[in-house]
Structures are given as C-alpha cells and as structure tokens.
A protein has these predicted regions:
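Cysteine-dependent hydrolase recognition
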Residues: 1-336, 341-344, 358
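"A position-specific structural signal for the A-helix of alpha-solenoid helical repeats
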Residues: 317, 349-350, 354, 381-383
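Primarily a tetratricopeptide repeat
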Residues: 333, 363-366
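Solenoid-like repeat scaffolds
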Residues: 336-342, 367-376
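Mixed-charge, low-complexity intrinsically disordered regions
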Residues: 343-346, 364
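Alpha-helical linker/edge segments of TPR/alpha-solenoid repeat scaffolds
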Residues: 356-363
C-alpha cells in the first residue's frame, strides 16, 4: 500500500536524518501511521525521482465515483505534502493553508513541499536538472479568466505574448516559435506542435496544459505532462486523476508569483495550489531560477557579442517595452540595428509586425519565400 511502501519509509528516513524534527507520541493515528508531533521542517523540497510511483489508485473495477470530491485516488506527491495535516482519512482533498501565501508560512503549517524529476525517459528527466503563449479553450469561464490574467502579467513584463481565443489547441497558423512560457487548455492529448517530434520549446520553458489526466502516466507520450518534460520544460504541472478545475493549480496565481513577485517556479507552484492530499504534481528542479540572468544582463551579453539562437527573443522583449513608452516605430528601429547580426528569423518577423502595412508585407514575403520558414516546425507559425 501507499502508506507501507512509500510514505512511512520516506517519513522515517527524513526524521532519522533530521530533515524533519518530530516527537513520537506513541501509538498510531487514525490512519494507522506512527503518531508524530512535528516541530520543525529543515528542508525546502522533497524531490522524488524517476521510479517513485506518482499516483495512488483505488479505482479497480469501479465504474464511477459517487462523490467526486471524496475519493482515495490522489498523487503520491500531494499526499506526502499533507502528511502532518489533520485528516480523518485519505479520501478527498484538504485545503492548502499555504495557498496564496508567499513567504515561509508553509513551514509553520508543517507542510512538505514536494517536487519531482520524472519524464518519459531517464534522459528527459535529467534535462529537468522569452516568449509566452496562452491557449484558451472557452471550456469553462474560470479557466479562461486565469489565462487572461496570466497573459496580462506576461505582457506587462515585455514577453511577446500570443493569446489564442479559439476553443481548439493552437494550430499551425498560429505563431509558436521558441515558447518560453505556455499555459493552455483543454485537450485530452498533446497535439499540433506538441505532437511534432522535431519541435521543441525554448530551453527551461515554464508552463503546462490544464487537463484532468495530464499526468495519468509519466512514461507515455500521449499525456501532456511527460511531453512538456521531453520538450525542454523546466517547470510543469500535472494531474494524476480528475482534480476538478476549482482544485487545480491556479495559473494566474502562479504567473503573478513567478513574473511579478519574482519567486522561483517551485515556490510559486506551491503557493498556487488550493488543495493537498489531491491529484496534483509539480515536475521540475526546485532550485531552477528563471530570474538568475535578468533582461538587462541578457542585453549586456548581446552587446558584448555573446549571442545564441534565443538572443533575438531578449531583444524582442526589450522592443515590446520600448513600444509601450515610445511607440512601434521606435521599437522597430531598435530591432533593425540587430538584423543580420545574430539568428534573427523571429526578430525580422517582429519588425514586420511593428512596421507600417507596406513594409510589413515586404518583410513577411521575404521571410516566407527567402527563408522557407513553412518547412521549419520551429517557425512554421510565422508563415
């Protein structure tokens, strides 16, 4: 069982190592676990690695769940997080007392923050150690409101942000080059760009696709969470079973924490989670810091000639900030000084977008026919 094979030995080892300070009270609690009184949590994250089970299933031959919020099915990670919360049983979710709390309150509640390094293959899992895309579906109003809020936050930070308001997942007629941030819903399996083997996200991208069973399997490419890990994600979310929208990780809270409050994605993920002892998992290196090299430092590197295929996106982000204060013409002029001096397919496209109509058409035609971007899965959306 989960208690015998996973939780009990993990907690016992953490106490033995001093990672958890706790007094044994004798006997067992109502769930049959050793009765412990925790007094101090001495670690930031418990990291589960590939090979540790991710879901607890009691479904067997059950055809349906009578009470949708009272089921013993849950994620291993979430149950471990809630180990020291008072619970009458493992059935159902319990409120996360650290939800929308942005400091160290989680320690005073004796919560265990859990992250996971897991993916389809071991090499994908090891890979876990400035564009944004918001893919709405109109499946339910709360989800779309979360995405709208996330989009506003990303735009305010200068990220080149595409919002797709169609109910289907972003198609090939939508720009989707080098995604550094992606939030979307609601498709049952990875499709469109995410189903192209040659397509990959920007290194260390952040985001996820909201779907009830996105992490039902972490070894199958037909589920969203492992596919994100395989395509360069450094921070992604998943649900091992049906969580119901109100109990899933809040995209808008997460985006505000990471991009406005400058928290680590792992910190933001826990603050954005309304419930524990439930279905959610977080996959990524808990120490990953997307703010380590701020935009100003990225621009300084470019000025020194230290560029790569993604440098153009730092310039585009800065151009978006220039456009807010000085207008599109100033932003286009800024980008033109870098044209041809570094990989610039997206940069040329952005200049076209910022330019007057006639120049826009000429630049777009040059991209389409001279560079044949419709043959490149990374840039086909620019066509």
């Amino acid at each position: 069982t989960y208690l015998d094979k996973i939780e009990t030995p993990i907690i016992k080892q953490l106490v033995c190592l001093g990672a958890i300070e706790a007094f044994p009270l004798g006997g067992s609690d109502n769930l049959g676990r050793e009765n412990l009184l925790p007094t101090r949590i001495n670690f930031d994250y418990l990291v589960l690695c590939k090979g540790v089970p991710w879901g607890i299933s009691t479904r067997a031959a059950k055809a349906k769940i009578i009470n949708k919020f009272s089921t013993e099915e849950s994620s291993v990670d979430s149950e471990l997080s809630a180990r020291f919360l008072k619970m009458k049983s493992l059935k159902g979710a319990v409120p996360n007392p650290a939800f929308k709390r942005f400091g160290d309150e989680w320690k005073s509640y004796m919560l265990l923050r859990v992250a996971r390094l897991d993916a389809i293959t071991f090499s994908d899992a090891r890979k876990l150690i400035d564009n944004a895309y918001i893919d709405k579906s109109h499946y339910a109003k709360p989800g779309d409101k979360w995405l709208d809020s996330a989009a506003r936050i990303l735009i305010s930070e200068g990220f080149d942000t595409t919002v797709d308001n169609r109910s289907a997942v972003m198609d090939y007629d939508t720009r989707f080059d080098a995604p550094a941030v992606y939030f979307g819903w609601y498709s049952t399996a990875p499709c469109r760009y995410f189903a192209i083997p040659a397509f990959s996200c920007a290194p260390a991208m952040i985001g996820w696709h909201i779907y009830s069973f996105s992490a039902l399997s972490l070894t199958d490419k037909n589920f969203w969470t492992p596919v994100f890990a395989a395509k360069n994600s450094a921070a992604t979310d998943g649900n091992v079973f049906e969580p119901y929208l109100s109990l899933t990780r809040n995209v808008d809270v997460f985006a505000d924490c990471v991009f406005a409050k400058k928290m680590l994605p792992s910190e933001a993920a826990f603050a954005a989670l309304p419930s524990l002892s439930w279905q959610n998992i977080y996959i990524g290196d808990p120490l990953y810091n997307p703010h380590k090299t701020p935009l100003s430092a990225q621009l300084e590197n470019i000025a020194r000639g230290k560029t790569d295929a993604y440098s153009q996106y730092s310039l585009i982000r800065n151009a978006n900030l220039i456009a807010k204060t000085d207008g599109n013409a100033a932003a286009a002029a800024y980008l033109k000084q870098f044209e041809g001096k570094l990989p610039d397919t997206a940069l040329v496209w952005k200049i076209a977008e910022l330019s007057p109509a006639r120049e826009n058409i000429l630049r777009a035609a040059k991209l389409l026919f001279d560079r044949k971007i419709f043959n490149d899965p990374q840039y086909v959306g620019l066509a």
